[in-house]
A protein has these predicted regions:
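N-terminal glycine/serine-rich phosphate-binding loop of ATP-dependent small-molecule kinases
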Residues: 1-92, 146, 218-223, 412-414
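Active-site core segments that coordinate phosphate-bearing ligands/cofactors
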Residues: 5-6, 18, 103, 110-123, ...
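Short, well-ordered amphipathic alpha-helical segments that serve as non-catalytic structural scaffolds
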Residues: 51-64, 182-188, 373-380
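Active-site phosphate-binding/coordination module
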Residues: 61-130
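Glycine-rich beta-strand-to-loop/alpha-helix junction loops that act as flexible
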Residues: 72-78, 206-208, 251-254, 391-399
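Enzymes and membrane/adaptor proteins characterized by extended Gly/Ser/Thr/Asp/Glu-rich
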Residues: 163-172
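Conserved catalytic cysteine-centered active-site region
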Residues: 211-217
Length: 439
């Protein structure tokens, strides 16, 4: 067996999973799972990066004790970054994408470049959390003035692990600073963001060797660049049907609706629909739309406790089936549902129809609203690509929810097949095996 470790860092949890490959197939073993949550510090929402690094090391140590690892790879959510100095020391915090101050950066950026021009270059949807707007809001700050490089979260982990400095391309594309055609940093976009080009690292491809870990317990363990944006890794693992057009619905904290193309779609219609063109493994294009996924449900679970503990998803789904169908509705993408905390009250204040009065009604409202939003975007994807899709491949944690998959099939009148639940971690591992010559 060839064993590799996939480190998959999500906005609400992280995990280290070991995958084994031989002629009979693939095995998996979840070694370590840990919670992740942005916290308010001095009125800013930040990630605890030292904790994420420590938990990554803990998981890899346990994996290495149990398996003869050939390599490891790290993926995470997109857009957030740290700044290092010339000695690879982290300058300041890693701000979280749900920090409301990012809105100011987006407004400032578009005083220097029009939205149509920006989309024609980068092809990335306009949403306040994008890296380019975060950096625009931070332009001229002390840490950017003193900093050596801006590194996205997986690249920051790699830097602290091996000293490597670079920016993996699938994650780089999501910053909205990379040219969708040339796959290089756009001087025009950087100028509009008031960002000196020397702060950005060279772009590298998935499968690049990043050196070996320097931690005493992980010394010598190779680190391989994977499709480090978690969606990029998930798409690597999607079992696309070659006989009929398929699209992907990745049901995680975010729900992503998209497909894989050979080229970006930079039309006016795509821009007006705010679809995004992300670079995928093998220089493909992931043409997709982000909508709020399980985030609202996760927040409800955190508020509506059972004896001080979060209720199991299975219990919530069972309770929900006793609630009235289509009694209430929210727009999951309304910015009011973006920040953490107080979600139940915000639903009460912004719901259409009956105001939910118990947990089962809240859960049904949230999941029905999510499915309706996803189904709408599925139809729009077909229009923008001029394709009649015949199958939906559901991946991610939400694909475990049979009733949600059935609702989606009913709403779209398409068969829904489930791909790997841990598609991101599997895709992470597949790229490692390709890089190591095992596939």
């Amino acid at each position: 067996l060839s064993y590799v470790a996939a480190v998959d860092l999500g906005a609400t949890s992280g995990r280290v999973i070991v995958f084994g490959l031989d002629e009979s197939g693939i095995t998996s073993d979840e070694i370590h799972r840990f919670a992740n949550q942005a916290k308010w510090v001095d009125d800013r929402l930040v990630w605890d990066f030292p904790y994420l690094l420590s938990e990554t090391i803990t998981g890899l140590k346990r994996a290495r004790e149990k398996y003869p690892l050939v390599s490891c790879g790290v993926d995470s959510w997109a857009v957030d970054y740290g700044v290092i100095d010339g000695n690879n020391q982290l300058l300041g915090p890693v701000y979280a994408y749900r920090d409301p101050r990012h809105d100011d950066g987006m407004a400032e950026f578009y005083t220097r470049m029009t939205w149509p021009k920006h989309y024609s270059i980068a092809g990335i949807q306009k949403i306040a959390l994008n890296t380019v707007y975060q950096l625009t809001g931070e332009a001229g700050s002390k840490r950017l003035s003193e900093g050596y490089k801006v590194l996205l979260v997986p690249d920051l982990i790699a830097n602290q692990a091996t000293g490597y400095v670079g920016c993996e391309i699938t994650n780089a594309s999501h910053t909205a600073m990379l040219d969708a055609r040339t796959h290089r940093w756009s001087p025009e976009v950087l100028s509009a963001a008031s960002l000196p080009s020397h702060l950005l690292a060279d772009v590298v491809q998935p499968g690049t060797g990043l050196g070996t870990w320097r931690d005493k317990d992980l010394e010598g363990l190779p680190l391989v660049s994977v499709a480090s944006h978690d969606t990029g890794s998930a798409f690597v693992a999607v079992p696309f049907n070659s006989e009929r057009p398929s699209l992907v619905v990745n049901l995680g904290t975010w729900a992503l609706i998209g497909t894989e193309l050979s080229h970006p779609v930079l039309t006016d219609s795509a821009r007006e629909a705010n679809f995004t063109n992300e670079i995928g493994y093998g220089s493909t294009t992931r043409f997709l739309k982000n909508v709020t996924g399980m985030w609202i449900l996760e927040q409800i679970r955190a508020e509506m406790l059972d004896g001080g503990k979060q209720p199991d998803i299975e219990l919530l789904l069972s309770e929900m089936q006793g609630a009235k169908a289509f009694a209430s509705h929210i727009n999951p993408d309304d910015p009011v549902f973006g920040p953490p905390g107080g979600m139940v009250e915000r639903i009460r204040q912004n719901v259409k129809g009956d105001i939910p009065s118990n947990r089962s009604e809240f859960v049904r409202c949230v999941l029905e609203s999510l499915v309706a939003r996803v189904a709408q975007r599925v139809g729009l994807l077909g229009e923008l690509t001029n394709t009649t899709y015949q199958e939906i491949v559901a991946v991610g944690g939400g694909s475990r929810m049979d009733i949600v998959c059935q609702w989606l099939a009913d709403a779209t009148q398409m068969p829904v097949v489930t791909g790997p639940t841990e598609a991101t971690a599997l895709g992470n591992s597949l790229v490692q095996w390709l890089a190591n010559g095992d596939l």
